[in-house]
Regions:
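Positively charged, low-complexity intrinsically disordered leader regions
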Residues: 1-62, 162
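Secondary-structure boundary motif
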Residues: 30-33, 37, 148, 176-180
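Glycine-rich phosphate/diphosphate-binding loop of Rossmann-like nucleotide-binding domains
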Residues: 50-65, 175-214
């Protein structure tokens, strides 16, 4: 694997050229076929899940275990303090720790951090408690603040604007099933839903197809 990826954050697939993403996909598929093996002995991935997760959490923990590393999953506000990412605010509400101090401390003890924080996810019967405009939400201020103060790579496990791991997974599936997807048609459809739903996954799915020339 080229050193061009080493130390880089993976916050949005748009930060990488399509050719770079395709290289990652090809390596992943070779590893899946057993033709190439990766090794992460002694490496630790911290996972901060502000939102519930099944597939992303299981895949991250499984990947680290199979590659010889370990994953530590935490739920902020339950397993940890609540965090603040805005500068210049009085922390007299429910946040006990600022990301400015949190990020460098956590990343001094682990090798990478994965973060899922999507304010557009609706849970149960509750309506989405969103007060900011989408123009503000899509800035993904927390994950970018964490990355800014981090000593190690930060991975976006789904935010308001992007789900780059989904992007890679969809690219891998399209290559695996279609061979060479370039020039083929990709249709994304969905049904009406009574609640507000996140847009990161469909955004990443469309970008995955576009990056493959579909």
């Amino acid at each position: 694997m080229s050193l061009q990826y080493r130390g880089r954050h993976f916050l949005n697939s748009l930060d990488f050229a399509p050719a770079e993403l395709r290289t990652l996909v090809e390596v992943a598929l070779r590893m899946k076929r057993g033709a190439e093996r990766g090794h992460l002995p002694g490496r630790i991935l911290a996972l901060l899940f502000f939102n519930a997760s099944v597939r992303t959490r299981v895949s991250c923990e499984t990947a680290m275990a199979r590659l010889g590393g370990n994953a530590i999953a935490l739920t902020p506000g339950r397993d940890t303090w609540n965090f603040e990412d805005r500068d210049g605010v009085v922390m007299d509400q429910n946040a006990q720790e600022h990301v400015r101090e949190l990020s460098p401390v956590v990343t001094s003890m682990v090798d990478a951090v994965g973060i899922r924080k999507c304010d557009l996810i609706t849970v149960g019967d509750a309506k989405t408690a969103v007060t900011e405009s989408y123009a503000e939400l899509k800035k993904d201020s927390f994950i970018h603040a964490f990355a800014r103060f981090s000593k190690k790579p930060v991975l976006n496990l789904e935010s308001n604007a992007a789900h780059p791991l989904q992007h890679l997974a969809d690219m891998a599936t399209l290559v695996e099933k279609l061979g060479e997807p370039r020039g083929k048609k990709y249709v994304l459809s969905w049904a009406w839903h009574p609640k507000s739903l996140p847009v990161a996954t469909p955004h990443s799915q469309m970008l995955a197809a576009a990056d493959l020339g579909m």
